[in-house]
Swiss-Prot record:
Composition skew (Polar residues), residue ranges: 92-101
Residue segments, region Disordered: 80-131
Biased composition (Basic residues): 80-90
InterPro entries: IV_Tat, Tat_dom_sf
Keyword RNA-binding belongs to the record: yes
Organism domain of life: Viruses
Residue span of region Core: 67-77
Gene behind the chain: tat
Region (Cysteine-rich) location: 50-66
Stated name of the protein: Protein Tat
Compositionally biased tracts (Basic and acidic residues): 109-120
Length: 131
């Protein structure tokens, strides 16, 4: 009869031997090596263009490009920047626009006064119903 400790040690040794054999066999198969290379090649290949414009959950996660663009909102395209007008050009246009606005204001105010006067005259001359 063996002691319980010896039985446990024997069972552990046999289980360790089995697992190590399995791991060695898996690591040496050419299929697993090809699978690892395939995964690495997919990671480093450039993203393919995808022209799907849908933003549903299925379309946002169907490829890495759509996930980055639609899911995360990251876009690496060059954005078009507006051209700023030179300071001198701004000063010239602002002074010219101020000169144009002054006569327009006086033109609009005069017809409104005339309309108010005609409305007041019409109300004053119209006979109203008394009490």
């Amino acid at each position: 009869m063996e002691t319980p400790l010896r039985e446990q040690e024997n069972s552990l040794e046999s289980s360790n031997e089995r697992s190590s054999c399995i791991l060695e066999a898996d690591a040496t198969t050419p299929e697993s090596a090809n699978l690892g290379e395939e995964i690495l090649s997919q990671l480093y290949r450039p993203l393919e263009a995808c022209y799907n414009t849908c933003y549903c959950k299925k379309c946002c996660y169907h490829c890495q490009f759509c996930f980055l663009k639609k899911g995360l909102g990251i876009c690496y395209e060059q954005s078009r920047k507006r051209r700023r007008t030179p300071k001198k050009a701004k000063a010239n246009t602002s002074s010219a626009s101020n000169n144009r606005l002054i006569p327009n204001r006086t033109r609009h105010c005069q017809p409104e006064k005339a309309k108010k006067e005609t409305v007041e005259k019409a109300v004053a001359t119209a006979p109203g119903l008394g009490r």
